[in-house]
């Protein structure tokens, strides 16, 4: 800044004091923001090219203005005045110390950021630590590199390549700030439920400033500030004890079948301080209470339950199978997550006891383990577009957890870390998503297809598109969904509460006349029957449990999932630790039944007989009047507003006929070849094919995989096609199938093929140098041979 502001540099520079006097009280913050905006506008009009928002004037009597509020307000003032392109904003702030804060300041207009205190701190630690292998300058360089890498990661999650494109883009959503603040500092950013204003923020600034003074060292009460005296029962310890106690109560209830033990667990959760949005809501009866025997049975309710998508790899084989078997005992569903599943589990499907087959099979962006056989043994195929706690990121598993067994299931090499890309390479539009849904319904015509979305602003529009793309289930994942597989920065700062996503999805589906043909599922930290009841009243048909289901099989929240050192054998691949696993399918089933029974009591108290009667009944909810004035600043009206058409369907009724589309040529091929292959015959056929014939071969591949698995069938089918094939030609084919296409094919040729042969060549009279296939061909393919006498499109063989 000093160099740029020299006379020869061509830039004028002005330092703006980002602080206010303690004597101004809480109102001083708003006054300081207004002053900064006025000064910035005046300097910009005077031709000053560099404006530095500087909190260096902080003292005993001067309080720092939060840098994000300052830069956002100044940026928007300059934009409104038409002056933003005339000057650069530089932030010199001691509170800029982590990636999220820096990403936010860039996103709200900062051109450069100087994290002074962070740089001084790491340099001091490096210089003063006798064991340090680096000096202060190197430590500062490493911090800068780490922050830059973190910002690049944030940009990549949003699909942005340059800082110039990210700066001022405001790709954020606000939770807990009122309109009076948002309109000034974050104008245009969605803030659905409001929250605190300038007065409360000013009080927080003053409270933090008080902590800079010497005096109270925490001798009489526990303080969170660094350097204060340690208290045995400080807040973090008490919180951890509560969590451990909650886990103990739950596991005791499961072991003993004790309603009393479960009630202790439930009361501990339901009586917590406001933690989630639905904690700010209370129940309003729809009618007089009903006898419990008039409410639908627990076994009918548990059919709506599922486990979160946790892979065999993230979890040990024992833990993964226990979840599947436990859910199958009660008619629920387990989601196998991304990474495949062993065939020895497929063949247990339908057994009254010992059914270890995961009824939901996930299709994620890495396509690990996705084969025709994998799809054929699913009751539901789940397309993961995003994960609640880390939207914009793909799944990943560290190399230490990729054992021989895991590598075999995922068709990769042991010891190598696996990271799925943020996008599906065959989905770049809602039409592409519709095509994948169509593909999956060809390979397994009996399975439902679900699409997993994250709670975010405007998710309702996306959900409506998913319904029109003919999915049966729309899965809304909240910010607490999938935290065990997410980096800390994403857990803390990405995703939205499920309540916002479910409410908006419900509203959009009803307004578009789509609600009765799809089921809405949600996840995001469900623990008790009351949580489920709240989700139902906001509009969810089905409910998914992640962390709680793991606790039910022995997880003690050691938070070592990523280290492969789980002490209870739940989330590790190490044999000696897996041997310590003590969970049982009966324990998982018992927990789900406890939840269902608590839910039945809640329905009875509301005067409702079935969950269908409860779904979408927002009139049975109202905002609580809390003891905490700050909690009362939030406005949950958008969540509980009655639909514009009160007679419209509020829950799933039945699918429409078009939700089971078929490929006429694909079905004809199946009918003409399957019996011959099964009997050991070799059949040769020829068909004309047009670009309206999509996903030809998937139905045959799925049928053969269901019967023969990954083994070659007794017979073969050699099929010649002539013409221009539609999308997903020869997708999901397997051993025993040979396709020859004389002509050309669209996108996705050979997607997820596991065997067989594909030959594509131009007609004999072709002029030469032909382009024979479109984009994303052989995506996720794990076996077979392909011969192409020409060029292909992009993203080939991913």
Where are each of the predicted segments found?
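Alpha-helix-loop-beta-strand connector modules within alpha/beta enzyme cores
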Residues: 63-89, 142-149, 153, 436-443, ...
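Long, distal/terminal scaffolding or interaction modules
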Residues: 577, 589, 603-606, 615, ...
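Flexible, glycine-rich loop/tail regions that form catalytic "lids" or insertion modules at the edges
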Residues: 1-31, 39-43, 47-50, 101-102, ...
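Catalytic cores of alpha/beta
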Residues: 96-109, 457-469, 527-540
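Flexible glycine/proline-rich, aromatic-decorated loop/lid segments
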Residues: 71-77, 100-134, 141, 357, ...
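Active-site cores of enzymes that catalyze phosphoryl transfer or operate on phosphate-rich substrates
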Residues: 1-31, 35-45, 375-430, 435, ...
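Gly-rich Lys/Arg/Thr-decorated short loops/hinges at beta-loop-alpha junctions or inter-strand turns
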Residues: 8-28, 53-59, 84, 302-307, ...
């Amino acid at each position: 800044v000093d160099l740029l502001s020299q006379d020869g540099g061509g830039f004028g520079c002005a330092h703006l004091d980002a602080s206010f006097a303690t004597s101004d009280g809480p109102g001083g913050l708003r006054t300081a923001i207004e002053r900064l905006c006025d000064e910035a506008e005046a300097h910009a009009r005077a031709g000053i090219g560099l404006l530095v928002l500087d909190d260096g004037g902080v003292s005993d009597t001067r309080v720092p203005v939060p840098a994000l509020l300052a830069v956002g307000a100044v940026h928007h003032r300059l934009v409104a005045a038409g002056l933003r392109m005339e000057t650069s904003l530089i932030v010199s702030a001691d509170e800029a110390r982590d990636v999220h804060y820096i990403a936010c300041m860039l996103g709200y207009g900062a051109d450069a950021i100087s994290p002074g205190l962070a740089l001084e701190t790491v340099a001091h630690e490096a210089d003063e630590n006798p064991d340090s292998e680096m000096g202060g300058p190197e430590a500062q360089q490493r911090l800068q590199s780490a922050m830059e890498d973190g910002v690049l990661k944030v940009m990549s999650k949003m699909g942005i390549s340059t800082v110039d494109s990210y700066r001022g883009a405001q790709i954020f959503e606000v939770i807990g700030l009122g309109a009076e603040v948002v309109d000034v500092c974050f104008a245009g950013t969605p803030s659905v439920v409001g929250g605190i204003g300038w007065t409360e923020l000013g009080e927080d600034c003053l409270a933090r400033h008080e902590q800079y003074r010497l005096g109270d060292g925490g001798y009489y009460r526990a303080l969170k500030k660094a350097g204060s005296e340690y208290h045995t029962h400080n807040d973090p310890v008490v919180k951890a004890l509560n969590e451990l106690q909650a886990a103990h109560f739950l596991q005791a209830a499961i072991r003993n079948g004790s309603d009393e033990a479960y009630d202790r667990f439930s009361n501990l959760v339901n009586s917590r301080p406001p933690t989630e949005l639905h904690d700010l809501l209370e129940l309003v009866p729809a009618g007089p209470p009903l006898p419990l025997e008039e409410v639908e049975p627990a076994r009918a309710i548990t059919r709506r339950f599922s486990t979160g998508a946790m892979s065999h790899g993230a979890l040990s084989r024992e833990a993964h199978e226990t979840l599947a078997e436990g859910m199958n005992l009660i008619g629920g569903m387990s989601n196998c997550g991304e990474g495949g599943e062993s065939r020895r589990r497929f063949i247990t499907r339908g057994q009254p006891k010992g059914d270890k087959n995961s009824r939901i099979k996930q299709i994620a962006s890495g396509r690990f383990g996705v084969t025709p056989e994998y799809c054929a043994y699913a009751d539901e195929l789940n397309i993961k577009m995003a994960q609640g706690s880390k939207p914009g990121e793909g799944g990943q598993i560290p190399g230490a957890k990729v054992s021989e067994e895991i590598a075999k299931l995922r068709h990769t090499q042991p010891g190598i870390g696996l990271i799925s890309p943020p996008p599906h390479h065959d989905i770049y539009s809602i039409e592409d998503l519709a095509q994948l849904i169509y593909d999956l319904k060809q390979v397994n015509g009996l399975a439902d297809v679900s699409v997993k979305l994250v709670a975010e602003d405007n998710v309702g529009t996306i959900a409506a598109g998913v319904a029109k793309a003919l999915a049966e289930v729309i899965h809304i994942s909240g910010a607490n969904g999938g935290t065990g597989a997410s980096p800390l920065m994403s857990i803390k700062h990405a995703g939205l509460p499920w309540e916002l996503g479910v409410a908006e999805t419900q509203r959009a589906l009803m307004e578009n006349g789509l609600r009765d043909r799809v089921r809405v599922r949600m996840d995001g930290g469900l623990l008790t029957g009351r949580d489920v009841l709240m989700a139902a009243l906001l509009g969810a048909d089905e409910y998914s449990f992640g962390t709680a289901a793991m606790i039910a099989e022995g997880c003690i929240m050691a938070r070592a999932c990523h280290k492969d050192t789980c002490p209870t054998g739940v989330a590790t691949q190490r044999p000696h630790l897996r041997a310590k696993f003590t969970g049982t399918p009966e324990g998982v089933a018992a927990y789900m039944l406890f939840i269902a029974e608590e839910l039945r009591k809640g329905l009875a108290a509301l005067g409702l007989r079935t969950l269908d009667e409860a779904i979408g009944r927002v009139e049975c909810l109202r905002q609580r009047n809390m003891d905490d004035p700050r909690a009362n600043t939030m406005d949950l009206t958008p969540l509980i507003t009655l639909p514009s058409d009160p007679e419209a369907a509020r829950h799933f009724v039945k699918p429409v006929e078009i939700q089971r589309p078929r490929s006429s040529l694909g079905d004809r091929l199946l009918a003409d070849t399957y019996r011959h292959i099964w009997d050991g015959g070799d059949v040769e056929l020829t068909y004309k094919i047009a670009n309206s014939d999509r996903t030809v071969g998937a139905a045959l591949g799925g049928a053969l995989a269901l019967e023969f698995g990954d083994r070659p069938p007794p017979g073969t089918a050699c099929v010649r096609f002539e013409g221009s094939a539609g999308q997903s030609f020869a997708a999901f084919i397997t051993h025993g199938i040979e396709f020859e296409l004389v002509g050309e094919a669209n996108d996705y040729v050979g997607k997820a093929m596991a065997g067989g042969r594909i030959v594509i060549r131009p007609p004999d009279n072709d002029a030469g140098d032909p382009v024979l296939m479109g984009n994303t061909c052989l995506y996720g393919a794990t076996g077979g041979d392909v011969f192409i006498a020409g060029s292909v499109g992009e993203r080939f063989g991913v």
